[in-house]
Amino acid sequence: MGSDKRVSRSERSGRYGSAFDRDDRDDRDTRSRRRDSEYKRYRDERSSERYDDYRDYDSPERDRMRDRERRNSDRSEDGYHSDGDYMDHDYRQDYYMDEKESKTIMLRGLPININENDIRELVESFEGPQPADVRLMKRKTGLSRGFAFVEFYHLQDATRWMEANQKKLVIQGKTIAMHYSNPRPKFEDWLCNKCGLYNFRRRLKCFRCGAAKAESDLEAPSGSSDAPQSTDYYSDSGYVSSAIILRNIGPHTVVDSILSALAPYVSLVVSNIRLIKDKQTQQNRGFAFVQLPSTLEASQLLQILQTLHPPLKIDGKTVGVDFAKSARKDLVLPDGHRVSAFSVASTAIAAAQWSSTQQAQQSGEGGEYAYLQPGQEGYANYGQCSQDYQPFYQAQTGAAEQSTAPQAEGSAPVPATTSAVVCQSPQMYQQPGSPTQSGTSTAANTTPASTTSTTEEAAPPNAVIPGVKYSVPDTSTYQYDESSGYYYDPQTGLYYDPNSQYYYNSLTQQYLYWDGEKQTYLPAADGAGQSGAQPNGANAGSSKEGKEKKEKPKSKTAQQIAKDMERWAKSLNKQKENFKNSFQPLSARDEERKESAAADAGFALFEKKQGALLERQFMPDMMMMVNTEEEEKPPNKALVAAYSGDSDNEEESERLLGAVDEEKLLDWKKLACLLCRRQFPNKDALTRHQQLSDLHKQNLEVYRRSKMSEQELEALELKEREAKYRDRAAERREKYGIPEPPEPKRKRFDPTVVNYEQPTKDGIDNSNIGNKMLQAMGWKEGSGLGRKSQGITAPIQAQVRMRGAGLGAKGSSYGVNTSDSYKDAVRKAMFARFSEME
């Protein structure tokens, strides 16, 4: 019967089931946990790849990444599937079937050990358009995440590069797939048209203003494919705005020039133009914004400006136009995207990247402006600007440029045709193969037939010659001089003041300003001086230009410029003296005199970085000027002759008193200090001793006091006493004496004795109420209480008991009364304890 025993119902389908069912259930649980872990890992990888795959560098998705990750669990439709649908849906195939062309290309499946340089070298090795940027996505550990982005300057460059490589690359023996990178459309949120706030998909009312979701859906359906899209309202990057950005603006262009250039096409006022300037140099950063009333007018103006032939020019520079990215958060595109707020710095970077892709062909009468197209000459060298410009840039800055050679009297100047490529910084560089401009050697040999101004004598190679055309000043190459607070231009040797926007020529001691129309530096003088400096060959155009200059008032006069230069010239006079003493011979030092403000500025400017200045070409000429200044006495070419050393007579007089005495105490031939009686090995050691030695300063002070008269000594002592600290407390103690010190405080005080009433201290008499009551009841004095007089005969005495001791406990009472003092209580307690020990 044991073999025929069947499994009971409780064993087969009871609470825990059979052993076979339990094993099968364990296997299913293990597989389920493994599948869940694989799904979780796959979901994390897909979420990170999806973000980097569909994001664009300027996309607002980057700012909303955290909210998107937080709401991943809620997505169940509109392209975002729920958790159960991840394994059944292929995002890659669905997305790349309808991918849109973009100027950013994504490389997927890269090796882990690859870096950005490897990708950049491989991409640049191909013929054709060169990329603008290559970015490899990395993890926190520094390893590659397996994909990278290659960004091109234009959409046509990216498409041509993709077609040339057939959307595949071979990197380190591995085939890499290439795809266009585009931002994923947002379906999970809806935008409120009233306040511009993005709300969660499940919210039926706006969180901020309470507007209904249905109203926003009717007015602007988010993510709808049927949304109207107008090509006139969109630029290449896919955004729309009522503002237009003007790129490649000259550094000295003003708002009036922009208004006059746009006047034939649109009516604007000054408030519609915003010209962006650098905070340090106060020059234009290369772009401006034009704000229009509506996007329709902006699109119409943009279409007109983009179809102009020749293109729009402002102050002789070809200007590029495009829609500007709005900084308002409520700007919504028809496809549901929101343009996030972009700072001016990001716009400047975009403008610089845009300008680096342009080719401006300039000539005397005008030129063409267009992008380099595939197949054109020089397209293969599209990205070699940074490599090719170096030798030509050095050749260009090694000598002063002169594009218009002076001709005979009455003949018009002949402009030299040049072509330049605008690189990432707003500088003009020559292309390979273009005719180079004439150098200073040609300009020095060819002189005008007749000029009213005197010719420059022995100008150094990098000296600025008035009337010669130069390239537009590039403030990005200026070097900041800490000693003077000015910016040094290594190309022209001029010093630039960002406050007054004037240049200072330290060789000729002149203030210059940049003229954008003439492309040259002109002296900041009156109109007569400027007109006299022009050649006779340009008399026809000088009168017209003179009228235009009169209409444009100067921001600062020559007097104001001199006052600005005077501030820092005073502070550096002392350093100038030390600098001049280190180079002048002893005979020249004995004949020191006050110098003009222009000379002070020149010495202060040339004092910076003496080691670097010695290597420059104009340093020997400057040294000759310093040494022979007192002998030749050239005419002062500064703007204001009224300013000289007289403005700081007090400081100059105090300094000269010590300087004359100190020079007599130094022997520069023997390199010895006669005051301290010390000899030094070289000139530098003697100079350091003179400037830094405390012993020399003390001896010099003693020597000066010995040469002073009694009145001078008294005046000096009085001045020193006034400058010293006055101890008024000591004077007060001397006058009124020192008060008695307070008595020291006692550490212990005797407790105050309180005399309280003690009526039973001497015993109880017969006058108390208790005694009278007992006598009324038949009690007699001396007998005990009770029926048989067996009770106590004396009253109960109040006693102090030990804490915690019962009434009958041993040692509960030491016989201490309430009237006993502290000493009596301690004495009785000690005696009781002693008795107990016995």
From Swiss-Prot:
Subcellular location: Nucleus
Taxonomic superkingdom: Eukaryota
GO cellular component, one term: spliceosomal complex
Xref: PROSITE patterns: G_PATCH, RRM, ZF_RANBP2_1, ZF_RANBP2_2, ZINC_FINGER_C2H2_2
Segments for region (Disordered): 1-86, 396-473, 524-561
Keywords, in A-Z order: Metal-binding, mRNA processing, mRNA splicing, Nucleus, Repeat, RNA-binding, Spliceosome, Zinc, Zinc-finger
Any one GO molecular-function label of the UniProt entry: zinc ion binding
Similarity comment: family membership: Belongs to the RBM5/RBM10 family.
Self-association state and partner proteins as the record states: Component of the spliceosome A complex (also known as the prespliceosome). Appears to dissociate from the spliceosome upon formation of the spliceosome B complex (also known as the precatalytic spliceosome), in which the heterotrimeric U4/U6.U5 snRNPs are bound.
Protein name (database record): RNA-binding protein 5
